[in-house]
Amino acid sequence: MEDENASLLRVRLDGRELELGDLSRWEVGPGDSTITVLWLPTNRLKIEHTGAGDAWITNLDTATPDKVRARKIFG
């Protein structure tokens, strides 16, 4: 599956869930919510699919691109 770009709509559940501009929702991997809780709406993201709904999500708008593990749970 190809990488895709997305925009962040909102961070939910203290960083444990991301909702993207296409209304998909992603559960953030254990330990990564301390990173995503600081992400802001409209941040540009790159999604690198790794299979079976799993992906690496990179925030392209942070000083050093933050990369977290996530699993698609809706959309």
What are these regions, as identified by a protein language model?
Residues 52-60:
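Short, Lys/Arg- and Gly-enriched loop/turn segments at beta-strand edges
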Residues 1-14:
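Structural detector for short beta-strands of small beta-barrel domains
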Residues 31-48:
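Short nucleic-acid-contacting surface segments enriched for D/E, G, S/T with interspersed K/R
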Residues 24-27, 34, 63-65:
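Short, surface-exposed beta-strand-loop junctions and turns on beta-sheet-rich folds
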